[in-house]
Amino acid sequence: MPIVLVRPTNRTRRLDSTGAGMGPSSHQQQESPLPTITHCAGCTTAWSPCSFNSSDMETPLQFQRGFFPEQPPPPPRSSHLHCQQQQQSQDKPCAPFAPLPHPHHHPHLAHQQPGSGGSSPCLRCNSCASSGAPAAGAGAGDNLSLLLRTSSPGGAFRTRTSSPLSGSSCCCCCSSRRGSQLNVSELTPSSHASALRQQYAQQPASASQYHQCHSLQPATSPTGSLGSLGSGPPLSHHHHHPHPAHHQHHQPQARRESNPFTEIAMSSCRYNGGVMRPLSNLSSSRRNLQEMDSEAQPLQPPASVVGGGGGASSPSAAAAASSSAPEIVVSKPEHNNSNNLALYGTGGGGSTGGGGGGSGHGSSSGTKSSKKKNQNIGYKLGHRRALFEKRKRLSDYALIFGMFGIVVMVIETELSWGAYDKASLYSLALKCLISLSTIILLGLIIVYHAREIQLFMVDNGADDWRIAMTYERIFFICLEILVCAIHPIPGNYTFTWTARLAFSYAPSTTTADVDIILSIPMFLRLYLIARVMLLHSKLFTDASSRSIGALNKINFNTRFVMKTLMTICPGTVLLVFSISLWIIAAWTVRACERYHDQQDVTSNFLGAMWLISITFLSIGYGDMVPNTYCGKGVCLLTGIMGAGCTALVVAVVARKLELTKAEKHVHNFMMDTQLTKRVKNAAANVLRETWLIYKNTKLVKKIDHAKVRKHQRKFLQAIHQLRSVKMEQRKLNDQANTLVDLAKTQNIMYDMISDLNERSEDFEKRIVTLETKLETLIGSIHALPGLISQTIRQQQRDFIETQMENYDKHVSYNAERSRSSSRRRRSSSTAPPTSSESS
């Protein structure tokens, strides 16, 4: 079914009855490029909820009480008893819109004149398109465009064309006031296939046509607010026959507590039975939605609009609906059910829309063809891991059935030799059991190789399985099937076996069973043990080890796993292999020799074990010799295996006796200390003997030649001892410089060189910084003369201006002073003479 992913964002805002935003995002309301839907008076109904609750809906769209706090809850007004019961049974209405008269109570509001869409005082909403045949035909072009989009930029649910909706309009609110506007730019309609199917089953076909959004339905049906999906005629509802089951079903759902802000952003339309799931990680929503958008397929509901007057379809309305229906893109469905197609193609009256069914079939084939092409790396890794687990499980089952067949074969062979013959029913039953286990084993092997081919296709991106079928793979598959198919056939079949006895060389002829030829090759099934060990190895299943191995070009196969086991626990591996080979070879020699061994020498199990042991160890006493070529061949293989195991034992013992690195370092340190002491002692002996020789030859009156020769011999011995100790010390130093120590020294030198390189790079960076600073300083120095000259000129200009101002002041002062002196002289000349002057 199609999956619609919606990412909740902070862009979700409340909407009041006029379409204006409330809350923290109200300032974005004016910037929204999407138009608003204007509801006219004809689409207003009594107050009813629009909570799209359903039992199969994951995130229903519910409007809590108080979602529009600016409007007081209006009193319930309805002309029918059903409307009053519906209003009383709802605990949490979606939006308390003001009640207005119903269209069918006021025909002058519901039915308008054809062709008067342009002169209408209000814009016609989507719900008014199907009020009648004339109105639907004429008002199809007058409907306002409804844009459906999600909050994410690369959403997987969007409309590709913005066209008017006539018959298939989805109303987000089923009631409003006169002249109210509702912005649906942030809302996505929601519809449910299950609720629609229940409504189609419950509502009978009727000729009376009501408005799709105005019919009062039970609260559990989402079509009361959504209308029809364009797949049939509008449903007629009888107000005087309320269904009690609807109220009982709505009561537990209406009490569901939810956040209106989150639900508005996360609610989406489940077209064709789709399921909405919110994204768990917001950081990956853009990438996921873009991937889904590349695989999206358009789903268009068929244009089946039925007008009034007995349910006759209107051609003009159907044409307008088919031409103007929005193309809604839904994510790629995994399974297209016939019920989902029938939801769009079948109407309430039984009419089927062929266009919807054809569109669904085309989208189904398109999605199936593009499913494998658009698989991302996450899907491939998950599919590859699942194939790994299945292959490991198949290998385990194959080993179980293979070992079961071997055990039953051994039991049947031993019982038929001592308890009963091959013609008994017990032997037949055991052989039938062996055959059954062999058939199951062959089936498991075939399925195992099929899984390997699927893994090859996933790893190499191949589309056809024939690409993986190389001649080498086909040969090994056929060889494996042939090896596992060998088993004793039910029935008693014999042949004549002739051999020559060991010591008497007399011919021996006897009648042997064919089962001996078919039983011994069953031990070849033990190769399944190596496969199981490989698939269960930590080196093979761990992703980190496989990544490191791939970087180092290491192939993780059975050989590599056996090498690691021989490195980790060589003694255990050799012990298990030797004991298993010993027991199997001894039983095989017993089964081969029992038809020609009259003295019961090699046909005895203990005697056969002795023969295999001395052959395995390459001793060969000669007291026991096989008579048949079968026994001789088993002894030959045992001798070869014994030589190899003996060499491995010697290598393992030598490795165990070898000193470890720490032990070598301790041993070298102790030997170096001892050699240092010996060098000191030898040097002291040389000095002592030299002194004694000097004393006995120079400091005595009578020279004792015997004593002098004795000290000379000791002196020569001390020199020789000193030289030998120094040679041993030099050899010890050479032995200490092993490959591991050289590697360690190389690592130390590499670290030193790396440190020097880092220091040189740091030094170069500092030099570059210093050069940059020097260049800046040189530029500043070059610009200094200009700055100095400019400063001098400015200071000179200021000085001149100051001097000019002082000069002007001085001149004005002198002029003022001269004027004042002349004024005083003039006043003194014009003054009358005094009495003293006159006398």
Curated annotation (Swiss-Prot):
Residues 236-253 have a biased composition (Basic residues). Residues 1-33, 64-115, 195-258, 280-375, 810-839 are annotated as: Disordered. The chain crosses the membrane at residues 398-418, 428-448, 474-494, 516-536, 565-585, 634-654. One of its GO terms (cellular component) is smooth endoplasmic reticulum. It is a multi-pass membrane protein. Residues 605-625 dip into the membrane without crossing it. InterPro entries: CaM-bd_dom (IPR004178), CaM-bd_dom_sf (IPR036122), K_chnl_Ca-activ_SK (IPR015449), K_chnl_dom (IPR013099). Residues 810-819 have a biased composition (Basic and acidic residues). It catalyses: K(+)(in) = K(+)(out). Belongs to the potassium channel KCNN family. KCa2.2/KCNN2 subfamily. This is Small conductance calcium-activated potassium channel protein 2. It comes from Mus musculus (Mouse). The gene is Kcnn2.
